[in-house]
């Protein structure tokens, strides 16, 4: 409960995490597992209550995704097991980094390709080229374009309604409307939809933005990867299979796999390599408060004449989501140019 009460969470984000957890507990019970899902003031309080009641010989858990989470698990004496939510463990990243003078994503990405075998012919890329980024910068098509297929939607049920009733009043943002799946089955359906209907045109338009579509040709799969409803290996396997079957051009397959095994895993590895000092790094000395444009009340419009910023923030309010170009090129760039304190942006 302390986690929920500690910040003003977006209503859809809080619902997504809690509903996914409760639905997973239901699925595990149906599969015959004994599940102890309890509400507690804090993770530590819930852990202590569980241990006091069940007296386990060993408590084991998948490695947390944060430095603080891992530190807490170690203090509690929890046996940690490697997470399968990343294909390159941070210890493997550290071994790759070694005493390199530079840690570039492209070098890491090529090492990952060779190690994992995606889009490879032996030790070389299948087409002789590692990177198709120069072909993946097309602007969005004009108004005559019929549009991109809408991602599947989920129907809210009693579990969803109970989660929403349990959320604190200070949550903000639009109510959940089925945009985000909260089950393994729903996440897999969205993966199949993306690979079949969207991936073929993902590459050329992966850096595009438009006011006519919030998702364009983006996968909209990152929430499921981040929470563990999908695993990076199965996502990349699906893309590899589609390429092998001739259903997806190389620029789209390579561009997507680069996002997953390249950028996503590179940033993950850098985080663990440089923590805990990384949390306080502020090389540019940015110390200004969050610009008012980033904050808004329900039903109001961000105060700005910059349509790109307004469109991105509308999407954050309506869906708790912004794709990678919106985060990097618009919202992140605005924070950089305005000298916003990194922690103010994070909170």
Residues of each region from the PLM?
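N-terminal beta-strand-loop-alpha-helix module at the start
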Residues: 1-40
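Short, glycine-/Ser/Thr-/acidic-enriched flexible segments
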Residues: 2-3, 66, 335-336
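Well-ordered alpha-helical segments embedded in enzymatic catalytic cores
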Residues: 20-23, 46, 308
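Beta-rich nucleic-acid/ligand-interaction surfaces
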Residues: 36-38, 42-49, 343-347
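Short His-Asn-centered micro-motif
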Residues: 38-41, 61-64, 81, 227, ...
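Beta-rich, aromatic/charged-enriched effector core domains that present basic-aromatic interfaces
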Residues: 43-180
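Glycine/tryptophan-enriched, flexible segments
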Residues: 116-257
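Active-site-proximal binding-pocket segments
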Residues: 220, 225, 230-347
